[in-house]
Design a protein with these regions (language model features):
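Fe(II)/2-oxoglutarate oxygenase catalytic core
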Residues: 1-159, 163-169
Length: 169
């Protein structure tokens, strides 16, 4: 069994098309210990080198991490999490993407970016970032334009508007 999982940052991202809120906000204890472990275990079997841009390019000067996509239709825990997130919004389930699980090893990063492509008519409007563990160094989500950074504890979520040009780090 790969024990490096205990020393890396796992973040789970879900995107929704939902109404605009002012600032990023932390939602405490959204995921249980068991849900965090289940998502880590399930994702670890599907991880691939993360890509950037709509062309799915691999560019480790911009992003160095691994990504797994989890479908609600294939896993009841994932389905429950998506429904929990939808319940915190006024948007329908059909507007939700699959879960994107990111694994950052020591030295991993994602340079400032937006979670939406401006030319897309079906742009992501909001992002939920979940911390699946808290045994890591670094790993803050930074918003340079508002001079704020967030470090989540296991089970917490960070919820923000992707269209506000925060340029997350």
């Amino acid at each position: 069994m790969n024990r490096v999982i205990l020393f890396v940052s796992f973040l789970l991202i879900i995107w929704f098309f939902i109404p605009i809120y002012e600032k990023p906000r932390v939602l405490k204890n959204v995921l249980s210990e068991d849900e965090c472990k289940h998502i880590q275990d399930t994702a670890s079997k599907k991880l691939q080198t993360s890509t950037v841009s709509k062309n799915r390019d691999i560019d480790e000067s911009i992003r160095k991490s691994e990504t797994a996509w989890l479908k609600a239709s294939e896993d009841p825990v994932v389905d429950k999490l998506i429904r929990k997130c939808v319940s915190m919004t006024d948007r329908p389930l059909r507007n939700c993407e699959d879960l994107q699980v990111l694994k950052y090893k020591p030295g991993g990063f994602y340079k400032p970016h937006q979670d939406a492509f401006p030319e897309d008519k079906n742009r992501r409007m909001y992002t939920f970032i979940f911390a699946l563990n808290d045994e890591y160094e670094g790993g803050e989500t930074e918003f340079p334009n508002i001079k704020k950074s967030y470090r989540l504890e296991k089970g917490d979520a960070l919820f923000f508007n992707t269209l506000n040009n925060y340029e997350c780090i």
